[in-house]
């Protein structure tokens, strides 16, 4: 890379000043070599049932590289499954039209214990997280909030079912 395209920074952690460049460099013209191609999530095969697959073997999910649809369908199936007793989940960034929250509300309405740990300090999504937290509570879900000194920045789900008197866990 030529020296004219290098940027010297005295602090290795404070690169906020680079945000000023976003208005000067457009992805749709001028310097396409400076941008990665837009990634499109891989779609699951037709008829793919994640809820059944995770009972057979481990499945690694990587978003946004894979479609979130199988996961949402799994939550909806778990919410309707009479053997499922609870769904517990951490929520970091909730979209204004969150289908995940809709699935959790549906599960609560079906009598499942639903617990959501919500990070209210999710940059740019704080208001969505606050609004959805209220709707989750109104639906009967238990909503927990992050810790003062720590930020919840992970997506974890625990689905607990009881089959033949034994508890089974999907994480």
Over which residues does each language-model region extend?
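N-terminal localization/anchoring segments of enzymes in phospholipid and broader phosphate metabolism
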Residues: 1-171
């Amino acid at each position: 890379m030529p020296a004219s395209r290098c940027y010297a920074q005295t602090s290795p952690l404070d690169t906020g000043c680079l945000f000023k460049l976003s208005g000067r460099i457009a992805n749709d013209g001028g310097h396409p070599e400076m941008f990665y191609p837009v990634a499109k999530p891989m779609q699951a095969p037709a008829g793919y049932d994640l809820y059944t697959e995770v009972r057979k073997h481990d499945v690694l999910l990587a978003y946004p590289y894979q479609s979130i649809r199988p996961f949402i369908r799994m939550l909806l199936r778990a919410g309707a499954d009479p053997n499922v007793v609870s769904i517990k989940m951490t929520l970091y960034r909730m979209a204004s039209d969150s289908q995940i929250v809709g699935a959790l509300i549906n599960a609560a309405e079906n009598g499942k214990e639903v617990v959501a740990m919500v990070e209210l300090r999710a940059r740019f999504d704080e208001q969505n997280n606050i609004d959805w937290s209220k709707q989750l509570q109104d639906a009967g879900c238990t909503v927990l909030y992050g810790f003062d000194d720590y930020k919840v920045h992970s997506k974890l789900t625990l689905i607990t079912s009881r089959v033949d008197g034994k508890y089974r866990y999907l994480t």
